[in-house]
């Protein structure tokens, strides 16, 4: 049973996706109740009552829907053989990235694994830049040279192709923040399959030793490639994995719960208490990568059940519509605008100019004098250029 409060009136309504709602100020803001947070070595944790404004609700819904549609477009481009190399989709896990980003301040940093399209979009790249990067276009996020796994943004350090490679990188970024006496946090994202990597334990030891402002975030989607978590981990309570590092479990399919947990964890780090581990319980709809149909180690019925009962976008839409924050007509208009943006981006990904061969020698080093480029066949003196400089030169 859910009670929706509009001004002083109580209107009972029923929805399995919402535990409790209170709405004030003519439905311009609302308070929802999340699933309880599980805690490790913490006396208290985030409040389960989370507040959201209409503006933020629309923003989060639009971002999650955009990522979902963008990933669908990326999958289609791959099937058309327009995407070369690997391609890992984020469909189903949108609330993890959107909720985390919503809790970040301008100076905070993030680093993640190869499932990075959504994070790249949230870090300032347009949908067109992401899709053009996938198809090797000069208008891509990194001029078409990075592909699916290597995209970047302001204070977003990738996109890393090696399992767990971002764990020590995030620790190093947090060390730099503390060294510079900056009140910021580095959020280091990885999957459940990477929690058994030795470098995670090494990183957490150093982070706790020096009380670095780093959040280790495990996006537990249930499968490391094609292996269920219980078949590879002696304990699947990943929020306790840090032992001496405190941890929080959060429903990773609830964008507001994710935002609440990360906000609380950031306050912990900024108070000088050191690192914290967050496990976000989520799910991926696609296979590990586009080469994996995702049906040999789980059933289609399992995937459909999650879509029906736990989908982060549908669940959030039901909440904000029930609360009166948005109308069905507003939802339809958002859907229309997102489709329009995706369609335009797909067209660019097909037609924009491909990255020229001249860019192969750019971005090797920064600001160095002209010299011979090693491992090339032409004995020609080359100036080390950035891709931006090379593109400008080619345009002349």
UniProtKB/Swiss-Prot annotation:
Heterotetramer of two PDHA1 and two PDHB subunits. The heterotetramer interacts with DLAT, and is part of the multimeric pyruvate dehydrogenase complex that contains multiple copies of pyruvate dehydrogenase (E1), dihydrolipoamide acetyltransferase (DLAT, E2) and lipoamide dehydrogenase (DLD, E3). One of its GO terms (biological process) is pyruvate decarboxylation to acetyl-CoA. It catalyses: N(6)-[(R)-lipoyl]-L-lysyl-[protein] + pyruvate + H(+) = N(6)-[(R)-S(8)-acetyldihydrolipoyl]-L-lysyl-[protein] + CO2. Mg(2+) binds at residues 192, 221, 223. One of its GO terms (molecular function) is metal ion binding. Disulfide bonds: none annotated. Keywords: Carbohydrate metabolism, Glucose metabolism, Magnesium, Metal-binding, Mitochondrion, Oxidoreductase, Phosphoprotein, Pyruvate, Thiamine pyrophosphate, Transit peptide, Tricarboxylic acid cycle. This is Pyruvate dehydrogenase E1 component subunit alpha type I, mitochondrial. NCBIfam families: PDH_E1_alph_y. Its cofactor is thiamine diphosphate; Mg(2+). Pyruvate dehydrogenase activity is inhibited by phosphorylation of PDHA1; it is reactivated by dephosphorylation. It comes from Ascaris suum (Pig roundworm). One of its GO terms (cellular component) is mitochondrial matrix. It is an enzyme of class 1 (oxidoreductase). The pyruvate dehydrogenase complex catalyzes the overall conversion of pyruvate to acetyl-CoA and CO(2), and thereby links the glycolytic pathway to the tricarboxylic cycle. Its EC number is 1.2.4.1. The keyword Mitochondrion applies. Its main location: mitochondrion. The modification Phosphoserine is found at residues 289, 296. PANTHER family: PYRUVATE DEHYDROGENASE E1 COMPONENT SUBUNIT ALPHA, PYRUVATE DEHYDROGENASE E1 COMPONENT, ALPHA SUBUNIT BACTERIAL AND ORGANELLAR.
């Amino acid at each position: 049973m859910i009670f929706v409060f509009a001004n002083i009136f109580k209107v009972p309504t029923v929805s399995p996706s919402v535990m409790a709602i209170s709405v004030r100020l003519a439905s311009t803001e609302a308070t929802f109740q999340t699933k309880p947070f599980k805690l490790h070595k913490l006396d208290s944790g985030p409040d389960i009552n989370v507040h959201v404004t209409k503006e933020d609700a629309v923003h989060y819904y639009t971002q999650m829907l955009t990522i979902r549609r963008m990933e669908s477009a990326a999958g289609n481009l791959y099937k058309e053989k327009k995407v070369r190399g690997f391609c890992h989709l984020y469909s189903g896990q949108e609330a993890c990235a959107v909720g985390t980003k919503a809790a970040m301040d301008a100076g905070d940093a993030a680093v993640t694994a190869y499932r990075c399209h959504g994070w790249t979009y949230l870090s300032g790249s347009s949908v067109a830049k992401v899709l053009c990067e996938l198809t090797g276009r000069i208008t891509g996020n990194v001029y078409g040279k990075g592909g699916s796994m290597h995209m970047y943004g302001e204070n977003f350090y990738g996109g890393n192709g090696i399992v767990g490679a971002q764990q020590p990188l995030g620790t190093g970024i947090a060390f730099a923040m503390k060294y510079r006496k900056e009140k910021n946090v580095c959020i280091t994202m990885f999957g459940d399959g990477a929690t058994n990597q030795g470098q995670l334990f090494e990183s957490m030891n150093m982070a706790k030793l020096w009380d670095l402002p780093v959040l280790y975030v495990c996006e537990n989607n249930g499968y490391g490639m094609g292996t269920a978590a219980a078949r590879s981990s002696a304990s699947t309570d990943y929020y306790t994995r840090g032992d001496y590092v405190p941890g929080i479990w959060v429903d990773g399919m609830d964008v507001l719960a994710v935002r609440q947990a990360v906000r609380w964890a950031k306050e912990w780090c900024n108070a000088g208490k050191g690192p914290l581990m967050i496990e976000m319980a989520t799910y991926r709809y696609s296979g590990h990568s586009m080469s994996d149909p995702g049906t040999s180690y789980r059933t289609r019925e399992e995937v459909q059940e999650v879509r029906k009962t736990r989908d982060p976008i549908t669940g959030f839409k039901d909440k904000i519509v029930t609360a009166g924050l948005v109308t069905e007509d507003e939802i339809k208009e958002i859907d229309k605008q997102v489709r329009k943006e995706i369609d335009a981006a797909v067209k660019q990904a097909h037609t924009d100019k491909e990255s020229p061969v001249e860019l192969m020698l750019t971005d090797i080093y920064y600001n160095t004098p002209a010299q011979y480029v090693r491992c090339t066949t032409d004995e020609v003196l080359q100036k080390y250029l950035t891709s931006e400089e090379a593109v400008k030169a080619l345009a002349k």
